Every structure is written in structure tokens, then in C-alpha cells.
Amino acid sequence: MENRFKSVFDIIGPVMIGPSSSHTAGAVAIGREGNKLFGGIPKKVTVHYYGSFAQTHRGHGTDYAIAAGILGFTTSDLRVPKAPEIARKRGVDIRFVEEKGESPIHHPNTAILDMTDGHKKVQLAGCSIGGGAIEIRRLVIHDIVVEPSGTLPIVLFIDPERKIKNQRSLTSFLQQKAPFNESRIYKSPDYYIYEYDMQNYFKSSLIGELKKKYKNIVCL
């Protein structure tokens, strides 16, 4: 069986505000990945809960945790419990929906975030797997469904030029700078999306170099 935890700290969980590493810290992490994918704070978010998230989100602080992550807060930020109020004051509309039936990504702690600013729309489907750790199992960008292996970190390159040479260049860059386990390409008439399941998180300097060299890069 594949080990989803990289260290004992992934099992214990992070320093956090809230009652549960799975339902609070993990939910903050899902919200933060939504913020990264969107490229900032969206104007409207609909959060679809499945499984135990749908049953216990109010009591376990999942709502304010998701909102905090969307605002870019960390798990230890003292503002986490007040995140829904802060979001409202910033003009961010966040709604929570309890869905019935099985999770589309097959995990009991599932949150699917539909995010928009009135022009751009993206979707992120994540699950909390314990100890504050999460997986991102599905993304929808420009109506293209992207299905990573789940484990973070993930690099996405959204290519409106639809040129394979761009993928080759990025692949060569990553092979030299940062190893990855798998890569995939997703195509539509308007965009190509290249997705890489990375082995390790980047240093901030490398993220800066990557974003300078390639436009439309997303590092989750």
C-alpha cells in the first residue's frame, strides 16, 4: 500500500486553530489550494460537502476552516474561526451545500469548491485524509477535467498556445530542478493543460523561477 504520509508530523497534524485535524486543519488546506488554483480570492464559492463532511461540518468547524483557506489563512492563524465574517466583509460569498450519496472522488471527507469571479470559473475537489493532510483528486479548468493522482505537490501549466514544445521545455526544466512521479496532458480546442505529480515541495526561490519562466503556472 502506498504511504500517503511523508513524516510522523503528517500523522500528528499541524499547529492549528480548531477541534479536528481532519475536519478543520484539512479543510483549511483544501481552501488554500482553492485559493492557489484560482490565483487569489474568488468572489463566489459554493462548497459541496460529501460523507462525514456533510454530516459534521458545523460542529467540527469545517465551514470556517474552508473559508479561512479560501482567504489564504494558515491553519494556525487566529482569524480562522472568524473567516466567514471576514469573507462577508470583503464581499466574498461562500455557501455550503450538504450533498447526499457517495463522494465523486470516493472519500468520506470530501469538499468540492466551485469558484468564480463572474468571469473565470474553476473547480477543485479535495479530501482530508487525516492529520491535516489532503489530496486533490479532481480539477476543472476552462471546462477541462484534470485528474491528478491526488498527493501534493502538483504543478499545472495552462497553455493557450497548445504547443507541445512548451510541454517539452517545462518537462526538461523540472527534470533538472525537481523530480516528478508522473505527468499528464489534457487537451481542449482552446487549451492544453500539463499536469505533474511532484515528489517534493519546491523552495520559494524555485517557484519564483518557474513562474518567471512560464506563464500560467499553478503550484499546488
Predicted regions and their residues:
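Conserved phosphate/anionic-ligand binding catalytic regions in large, soluble enzymes, centered on
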Residues: 13-33
